[in-house]
């Protein structure tokens, strides 16, 4: 049985990182403290992304143009950056997610 609302033979396209994403990341960095950056490599379904985690575990993720761009962004903003595939994610992020679910 075919589902008429499903598209066939039309591959999806990834949305590129935009200046809005860069602006959002800059604003986020300026309004939080103790931030670390985690650069996530491109996958089959997502472009390269940057995950920012604040000292309290609050986090945000946005697409970025490249791995190099993400590390340069972190350096310019004085925050450490790591390759997420190598170091993983901080426990405080998981703890923050858990606290948010309990609210």
Q: Which residues does each PLM region occupy?
A:
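Intrinsic disorder
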Residues: 1-103
């Amino acid at each position: 049985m075919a589902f008429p609302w499903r598209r066939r033979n039309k591959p999806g396209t990834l949305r590129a990182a935009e200046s809005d994403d860069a602006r959002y990341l800059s604003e986020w960095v300026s309004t939080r403290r103790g931030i670390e950056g985690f650069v996530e490599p491109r996958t089959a379904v997502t472009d390269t992304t940057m995950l920012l985690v604040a000292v309290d575990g609050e986090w945000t993720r946005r697409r970025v143009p490249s791995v190099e761009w993400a590390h340069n962004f972190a350096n310019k903003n004085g925050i450490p950056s790591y390759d997420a595939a190598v170091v993983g994610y901080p426990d405080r992020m998981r703890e923050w997610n858990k606290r948010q679910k309990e609210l």
